[in-house]
Amino acid sequence: MFQRFTSLFFNTPAPPEDSNCPGAFVSEEDEVDGWLIIDLQDSYTAPPDPGASPAPAGRPPPAPSLMDESWFVTPPACFTAEGPGLGPARLQSNPLEDLLIEHPSMSVYVTGSTIVLESGPPSPHPEAALPDQDLSDGELAPALREPRALHHAAAPMPARAVLLEKAGQVRRLQRARQRAERHTLSAKVLQRQNRARESRSRRPKHQGSFIYQPCQRQFNY
């Protein structure tokens, strides 16, 4: 093999081929846009494998396997060039690729209110659902306690909502009272009240059809 390469480089005649050496199987080479296309001979067969086990006596020998594909495509020179500006393209791994895809059931944002087990309709044959082997009370206890714990975790949520609504109502009442007190203690309201009192005191006591009559003269001078 090395003698063939040296003969190609130095233009020396090729040495005589050995019968044991496999013959060349490349019949044509063509380079198109940086791609090297090689055509193989149709009569090329794969060499026998010395380490393969012989076929059993009852089976016929396998047919010689021809190479299915006779075209080999090599990458263009831009991927194999060497140099500071001609080096092969290096792909950098993104750190986000290492993140695991989280299943919705395993999410950390799931609260206790969403985990509620709905009891289905009772089975017509409850004894058939149990296994044949007898289980102790200690083994059956966790299966019965688990849905109860989940229901207890979901129960406080409505009570908390009611408490929040009551607290909101109390805050609204307090704000209304504060606004009323500020309105009564404001300077404008006090001035209006004082003016109303003064206007009432200035009014005469007798109004309407009352006629004032002068008194008789006592002295004649």
From Swiss-Prot:
Superkingdom: Eukaryota
Feature: compositional bias, Pro residues: 47-64
InterPro entries: TP53INP
Keyword field contains Nucleotide-binding: no
Motif (LIR): 26-41
GO MF annotation: an example: ubiquitin binding
UniProt modified residues of type Phosphoserine: S136
Principal subcellular localisation of the protein: cytoplasm
UniProt record, GO biological process: autophagosome assembly; macroautophagy; negative regulation of protein localization; osteoblast differentiation; positive regulation of DNA-templated transcription; protein localization; tissue homeostasis; ubiquitin-dependent protein catabolic process
A Pfam entry, by short name: DOR
One GO term describing the cellular component: autophagosome
Region (Disordered): 41-68, 177-210
Claim: Transport is one of the keywords in the record: no
Known function: Dual regulator of transcription and autophagy. Positively regulates autophagy and is required for autophagosome formation and processing. May act as a scaffold protein that recruits MAP1LC3A, GABARAP and GABARAPL2 and brings them to the autophagosome membrane by interacting with VMP1 where, in cooperation with the BECN1-PI3-kinase class III complex, they trigger autophagosome development. Acts as a transcriptional activator of THRA.
Assembly mode: Interacts with VMP1, GABARAP, GABARAPL1, GABARAPL2, MAP1LC3A, MAP1LC3B, MAP1LC3C and THRA.
UniProt comment concerning the protein's domains: The LC3 interacting region (LIR) motif mediates interaction with GABARAP, GABARAPL1, GABARAPL2, MAP1LC3A, MAP1LC3B and MAP1LC3C.
Record-given protein name: Tumor protein p53-inducible nuclear protein 2
Organism: Mus musculus
